[in-house]
Amino acid sequence: MAFWLPQNIQKRLLLYVLQQISLFSNIDLSNLDVSIGSKSHFSFHDVNLSLDDLNIPNVQINEGIVDELVLKLTVSGGVEIDGSGLRFIMTPLYSSGSQELHSDFLVKSIQDLTNSMLQFSDPLTTYNRYKEDDISSSDSSSDLNSNIEASKPAANGSYTLQNMRNKALNVALAKLKIALKDVTIRFIVNDRDPSDNIVEVHLESIQLITTDANLRHINIENITISSIQKQAVPDSPVHPFNNDDLSQSVYLSKMEATSLYMSAMEEQSNEDPSEPQVTQEEQENDKCKESLMEINNLNIAFKGLSSVNDLRMSNIVIDIQDVHLAIHKIVEIKNSTLKNIIDIIVTHLDANESFSCQDSQSPSPDKQEPSALSSVDIKCIYLNLGQDITVILKSFKLEQKENNSLAFSLGSFYSNSSPLTISHKTKPLLTGEQTPQSIALNMGDELDIIISHDGIAHFFKIFQFVSKCMSFYQNKSKGMMPQIASDTKRTVQLTSKAVKLSLKFPYFLLCFQVSPFIYDSNRELYIELVDVFKKLPSRCTKILTMSSITISNLQSPLQLGSYDDTLKEALIYSSVHAIIKEVIFNEEYSGIVQLVEDISAFGKLFTDSKNSECTGKSKSKRGSFLQRSVRVLNSSRFVYKQSLSANFSLKIDSMKLKVSEIIGPQFGSVEALLSNNFFAITDDSQIVYFTKNLKVERKTPSLLEPQEIMSVVLNKAVNEPVLYVHRRANGKLKVIFNNIRIHYYARWLEILKKNIGPDNASSKDEPVSQKLSKKQPTSGFPWELKCLDCSLILHPFRLKSVMVIVLDNLTTGGSSFIPQAKLLSKANTLFLIDDYQNFKIQKDKNWPSLINFYAGQGFSAIGKIDTLNFLINKSDGALLLDCKIEQVGLSLCADSFQTFCQLCIDLKYPQTFPDEEKFRTQLKNPIDVFKDIDCDLFNSAFIRENNHQNDYDSVHLVDSFLDKTHEFNNGARSKLSSQGSYEMDSSSGTATGGILLPHESYLDSAQPKEEDTPPIASKEQERDVDIRGSIDVEKVVIKLFDGYDWKYTRKFIANTVEKLDKELSKAEASSSKSNVPQSEANIFDSIYISANKNNVTDLRRNLDGEIQGVQNSFSDVSKVNLRPSKHYKALIQLNKVHVNLKNYRVDEPDESNSDNSTDVLNRCVVSIYEFEIIDNVPTSTWNKFVTLLKHEPWPHSSPMFLLDLEFIRPIDFLQAVELVMQLNVAPLRLHVDQDTLEFLIRFLGFKDKRFELIDEYPDIVFIQKFSTNSIKLRLDYKPKKVDYAGLRSGQTSELMNFFTLDGSKIILKSVVLYGLNGFDELNNKLKAIWTPDITKKQLPGVLEGLAPVRSFMAIGSGVKTLVTVLMSEYRQEGHLGRSLKKGGNVFLKTTTGDFVKLGVKLTSGTQAILENTEELFGGVGSNGRVYDASKFGSADGADSDTAAVLDLDTLFEEDQLVGSKYSRIRDHEPTAVVIDMSSPGDHNEPTIVSLYADQPLDLPTGLKEAYSSLEKHMHIAYDAVWRAKGQMKDDKRGGPSAAAVYVARAAPVAIIRPLIGATEAVSKTLQGIANQVDKTHNEQINDKYKSNRTDS
């Protein structure tokens, strides 16, 4: 039965509706009557809504237009609203302070309805009810206050009217129907920026239908959300609304049963002139409209709004058909628009959260309110990621359970597009359940995803978009969201099956297979296994395996230990920390290169985004790495550690990496094991990585054991990182190696050469500089590499020996893609071992340093390199290599010296060629040698015919030419002298004018023919230099020790001596004593040992004395000490060594393309500014073995040694290489002691067969040309023994050992040689040229240096000068008076020095003879030169001193090390050799100095030293007599015989010692006189003799 509704109530109901939709504010309804007919309705067109009366929570309405609105009222009480063309422009509100909640808005609407229907009801009652429900609003309160003042109804009738009102409203709500079409809502996100985007929501139709049982249905068709790029937004609404209230006219109308149609309003009917402009603007906006989201059908069913007292909604069921999301357009929303949207969301969430927090603080009911939502069902979701990339989600369901939990599921998730393919089998794919405490997710099937580069690019844009949203959200939500208790936070749990992700590359697929994993937000994400496969069309290989992966997202940052750039301990705080137990990687090198090239395309995405992020970051944060510090209490002191905040940290327990076929199949694979790894990404995009254990090996079937490449050296107590990598925010990459040994194997060069493919063969011959210039960016990231306490182990190609370079602190840096780098190494120690198999590591022992480690493992420390600077650069198309070294020091024995030299040669690949490739042995076409020969030339008829024509053709001598010969010779001589070269043959004596002086360099200076010209690098070739290298060494010191470093050498020599001893013993036992033969042995081509039955016992003692420098005749040596001597025997010192290298660009054509040209391959210039050889042999008294000959014309800026080498290829397509050498040597001063000479010969002649380099095709260097300047020598030679056996065999050079030379003049004349086959032939040729020249032409200069002849020649020269001066003056003046005085002065100047020097020699010789005579009679001998009273204070001291004196017989004992066949000679200036026991040394070893050393500088100094010497020796004589007197008194035997004995002991000393003092005093005086006359003499003496002053 229809419910009857009174007319007055219908009018009030209509009034309420009009008030709520704010219509008809300008329409007069005073005569309005409402009919209760079945077809009563109201129709409105083009209505502008009153904005002041429209109040929607959190939104400000700027414009509201309705094209058509129809209101229908049925007899049964139902209300139908039909509308179309609804357009709203709104601006979201950003402030939540005065905004209403949705519940407030609903209650306020009902309150307005009540007030409109019942004006006489008691407003206090309504107000109190609202007050009790905590609902208030400004609008409602103002209306209530006005109504309270207007009328006050009776209390008894208010309840009846209220029931009537509620009943009427319930009927209206039960029959409410709404149908709206073409609804458009535009949200102005930022009204301050007109150019910002506008979000438009368009609904094609909305229907609200109410069925029985209060079940309501909302059906929305075709929802579209778009983004509009608007150029200008008006500040005020387009249509200015009137403030007249339409409700007044409706309220005063008395018309009933009227069908009202209002199509126009008087004030609104006038056309607005701006309306056409708005329409045009909208049309323009539609052109730039981008659709972001589309929903084709949305159905919402719910129960609720049953009565005024019960406005709750329940059992909400949402059914959505299809949802289309344009993700690729959403991510392109402007940042300002996105930021504003996030601000609105955060503001509203903050308001709701605040309300929920206030509600939670009030007393909670016993039962929690159930959720109104019942279920959500979305049939299909289409995610459009870009062109041809669509992801489809089907059957998404959300259902509310009885226990207030929410269950949801996803049926399928797939994509069939080419850039992205997603598939699975089982449905549903994902299920889950949400409770107030937790969210549980379960993926029920394996997921297979294949994505290409385009797909990753789109996903990366989405990731960037989400990151921006999260960043905006976090920045806005700081300080706004209230703190929620930890017990209310939901935990998330995810259980997943296997996931397979494949990255699509052009030639392969990279597949990631993730095993089933579990995620718990309270704990961690755990993945058992991740495998990475590389799928090729023909095969599939596993390249990566990661096991036991744990990722923790912590609430509070985790403190982790780390290190800074200086390897000092630091702290890292990370909120996301991952742990991987093991990582295994295995792939071929070519596959890695291809993979890196393909992944680099993806890297551009990250690079571009990172550059944009870095530009927005502040400068202060860029350099904030490890700038903060944390104070940690450690025992009783504070330890400061730098700290760093990280976004992500990763710890990997073990990493096993295997890379195969790096160079080729023969090389095998390289395997690396890294333990205890740590990786972190900081807040400012810095990367930190380090590992604490590292081992890299090479494995191949050809090797029995793995070949070590890189490993940890020492087991330190403090476990520091061995590899540290740090990438700063500015892109600089820093790598540090610590406590690592790195191996270099020359064998790798052979594998590299064999595995150069045909594609690389053409580029192999390309110049290095051109290779570096290809495909180089203009700039790159800076990098730096450091090696701290590392060692570089160099393995030669053929030898078993190894050299180790210990790098204390090496730093190198440069920029990527730019051929420029700098290297600095402060201290580098060199170690050497003869066989690397002898290197046995003691793992249990802790070594303090690398030097101690290698020294304790059998290595020999051979040298040190201080402050090495190395620079690589590119200039003028050439690669520049510049090396500067401050000092190089080497300490070598004979065996280690050979090992070192051979190892340096063997560090490169021994490239040799067969003769077929070096020489053209066969000609393509035969050559007719008689082609151009006239066969009739020598016939008798031809000779007679042409005989008469040759009568006047004979050669005529030109006299003038011969006359000018002398002038030419003199001019050439003066020119050569001015240039400082000694090419003039001065040894030929005084040249007469008629003798033609040959010009040695004439052949070189003449212009030869083109085909005979030796190739020399021209200026054009200098421009074609590919590599320029220079090595500058400030100082080189090479110490040569006697003895042997290698245990093998010492053992071999000792076994040889033992074998020799056994042979002699066996021969002596088997034969008679008189017929025992002499045994000889030759060891290492440098040690000659011979012994017979008489000297077998002394053989070991002589060997030990030769090596260690001290011989003791009284000690019994059972074992030879062959270890290196305590002190070096010779020292080579080079100053300012410069090596200049040039490598030229040459083509390597084959024979068909060759032009038979000659190529200069490279050039090397070695120059030594100054060099000396110091003599430190104990038995030698001389100081400098070789030094510069002073006071000779040699340019000061010219080096003493210059060697210019050019390597030339005569024919460009053949492999034969020839050498052009040019040598220049300064004048030299030689002080040659025979013992030192034999040591150097023995040292340099040592040859061990273990270190011989044998090539497949032995090659001897062909010297195309060798040239040298004239070398002037001044020689002092002291022989000590003569090899009579060699003399008898014809070795005439042994005759030199009979003579002592002092200042002999020798000139090695300039030589130019062509066509020498090797250095052996060069040596023989030089001997054949220089030896006859010296013996035939330079004997006067050699004999001038003989000791007995030198003084007489000097006197004879003085006499000759005197006579010459007298005769010249007499011829000019006719008398001898003045000429005699002048000649006498010249005679004194030229002969005084020689007379004095002769006196010095005589007195020194006399002193030595007297000291030896005293020593034979029991005196102290030469030990008395330094007086020490303590030694003569007791009788015990005398006995010990006598025993400590080194016997001169042992001093001149034959050198058994070079053969006992050498005989002793005792008459070679023994007066110049003395023994000084006073100088301090190790174990009181004697130091041998000369009587000529430490001479006084002038006569006064000589007199002082003479007086001191005389006083010293008189004291010695006095002490000897006084000591003898004391011994006589203390002798208990007494008697004349005892007195005679003591007197006999003291008499020689008392008599001879004053004589010794007198001779020494005379010698010192004469030395002072000689140095006073000749100021340069003392400098020469210091160069020649060892000084005792420096030793003290």
UniProtKB/Swiss-Prot annotation:
Entry membrane topology: Peripheral membrane protein
Residue numbers carrying Phosphoserine: S236, S249, S1086
GO molecular function: lipid transfer activity; phosphatidylinositol-3-phosphate binding; protein-membrane adaptor activity
UniProt cross-references to Pfam families, sorted A to Z: ATG2_CAD
Primary location recorded for the protein, binned into one broad class: membrane
PANTHER family: AUTOPHAGY-RELATED 2, ISOFORM A
Subunit structure, interactors included: Interacts with ATG18. Interacts with ATG9.
Protein name per the record: Autophagy-related protein 2
Gene coding for it: ATG2
